[in-house]
């Protein structure tokens, strides 16, 4: 069995642990001399290990897609699918989000509200990765097979370059009301920058990579991972900007990002495939091109 790891323990775990410790050591002024307290603490530790390693989700089984999820026609240019909408002509997808973080270190631009990646995501949404993935399939979005992770030699130095098939290019836009009350639409990449170089993620820098399924677990659904600024194979979408393989570089631009809980609409827009230089080209069957 392949474990589906969570990179950090879930936030709810820390809340439970804090309440437990307050009850044991503050309210009751007790110590671990009491055998019952030892049992309680042992249970907390076991749950901690399970949740942080992925065992918790293994016990629960794979996250299931929403039942009876069918597109409903609103007009010639809009269909509803669960909590999202899409345009069959432009193949654009849009859904409601809210500002979840506007100051802290980020690994994701968008996550759903139900999973463990929420504390490191710029935006959150009630729309699930399943809903988005189904809409993308209906609209014939083709995921890229470009390589997400670098290979390293024994000394830790990267080997070669990431290979790319040129597919899956997309833009992620945010639409919201500005301070003057007027509607603004701009790339979500304008809200996040590399703290060292000060360069923003920018426009048109996203790739639909489609997540992975391991032992029946759709990783995007297990983690709620929709769009990652720190590359992750479980995310539906990734950016490949310089530094996107480093989880300590990406922060919101506080002067750009609206206040916490501000409601925004996220728009996924497909872009044309791009031509990739031969040195970086990944041929369609997933093998690396050789001369």
Task: Go through the PLM ranges and name each one.
Residues 2-8:
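Extreme N-terminal basic, low-complexity initiation segments
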Residues 43-52:
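Bacterial N-terminal signal peptides
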Residues 55-59:
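Boundary at the C-terminal end of the N-terminal hydrophobic targeting segment
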Residues 62-291:
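Long, low-hydrophobicity ectodomains and other hydrophilic envelope-associated domains
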């Amino acid at each position: 069995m392949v474990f589906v790891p969570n990179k950090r323990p879930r936030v709810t775990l820390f809340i439970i642990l804090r309440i437990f410790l307050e009850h044991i050591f503050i309210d009751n002024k007790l110590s671990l001399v009491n055998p019952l307290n030892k049992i309680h603490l042992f249970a907390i530790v076991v749950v901690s290990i399970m949740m942080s390693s992925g065992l918790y989700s293994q016990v629960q089984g794979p996250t299931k897609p929403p039942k009876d999820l069918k597109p409903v026609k609103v007009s010639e240019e809009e269909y509803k699918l669960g909590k999202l909408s899409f345009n069959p002509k432009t193949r654009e997808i849009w859904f409601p989000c809210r500002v979840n973080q506007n100051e802290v270190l980020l690994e994701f631009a968008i996550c759903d509200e139900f999973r463990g990646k929420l504390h490191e995501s710029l935006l959150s949404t009630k729309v699930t990765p399943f809903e988005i993935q189904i809409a993308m399939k209906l609209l014939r979005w083709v995921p890229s097979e470009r390589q997400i992770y670098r290979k390293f030699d024994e000394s830790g130095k990267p080997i070669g370059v990431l290979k790319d098939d040129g597919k899956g290019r997309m833009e992620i836009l945010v639409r919201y009301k500005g301070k003057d009350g007027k509607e603004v639409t701009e790339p979500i990449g304008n809200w996040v920058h590399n703290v060292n170089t000060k360069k923003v993620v920018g426009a048109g820098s996203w790739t639909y990579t489609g997540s992975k399924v391991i032992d029946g677990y759709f990783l995007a659904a297990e983690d709620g991972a929709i769009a990652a600024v720190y590359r992750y194979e479980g995310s539906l979408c990734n950016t490949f900007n310089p530094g996107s393989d480093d989880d300590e570089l990406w922060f919101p631009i506080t002067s750009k990002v609206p206040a916490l809980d501000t409601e925004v609409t996220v728009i996924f827009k497909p872009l044309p495939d791009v031509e990739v230089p031969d040195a970086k080209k990944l041929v369609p069957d997933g093998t690396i091109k050789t001369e």
